[in-house]
A protein has these predicted regions:
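Active-site nucleophile-adjacent alpha helix/oxyanion-hole segment immediately C-terminal to the catalytic cysteine
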Residues: 16-66
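Bacterial N-terminal signal peptides
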Residues: 1-9
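N-terminal signal peptide c-region/cleavage motif recognized by signal peptidases
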Residues: 11-13
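Conserved active-site-adjacent core of cysteine acyl-enzyme catalytic domains
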Residues: 20-21, 42, 56-175
Length: 175
């Protein structure tokens, strides 16, 4: 999880120089940040009512029979996913293609968000682990703040760009 101690505060709707109303969903297992991040983007693109549950998306990725992950709750369904799988879920369920991008500077983030395109950031959380968050807003200034949908957190929060930049290893821009 990306909680930053004193620099973290929860917010309903922060004033931002660029802001997208991407719905926030928490991950339903300890390792489904990738599915929850994709679900957030699909809900932004198609609406919450047209967004499948996380377990259905895992079934689709795994090629599992319907209700294997949702109904039975098979332990094989609880696994990590790749950034490619996130992009594929967004294309399949959300009808939107994605571009892979390197970590960006605040001005690129602001321009991307102002064009209506959310950004998924893959961040390092340990020596061999990563986490996926959705960047949905930025407040510019001497020390820019990002508005993040973190699937592990109960609500969106702001984080200094400089902190996220030190952890950010890969990105997806949803077209």
């Amino acid at each position: 999880m990306l909680f930053i101690g004193a620099s973290l505060f929860f917010c309903g709707m922060a004033k931002a120089d660029a802001f997208l109303n991407v719905p926030h969903f928490q991950q339903q297992t300890p390792v489904w940040c990738w599915v929850a991040a994709a679900q957030q983007i699909i809900a932004y693109k198609r609406g919450v009512a047209a967004t499948p549950p996380q377990c259905s998306m895992v079934e689709a990725v795994d090629g599992a029979s319907p209700s294997m992950c949702c109904g039975v709750g098979h332990p094989g369904c609880v696994h990590t996913g790749s950034f490619v799988q996130v992009a594929n879920l967004i294309a399949y369920f959300g009808g939107s293609f994605s571009s892979y991008v390197l970590p960006a500077n605040p001005y690129v983030i602001e321009n991307t968000l102002n064009s209506g395109r959310p950004i998924l950031a893959q961040i390092v959380t340990g020596s061999a682990s990563t986490h996926v968050v959705v960047i949905r807003g930025i407040q510019m200034g001497p020390n820019p703040l990002l508005l993040i949908n973190d699937p592990m957190a109960p609500a969106p929060y702001q984080i200094p760009f400089s902190h996220l930049a030190s952890l950010w290893i890969d990105g997806i821009v949803v077209n």
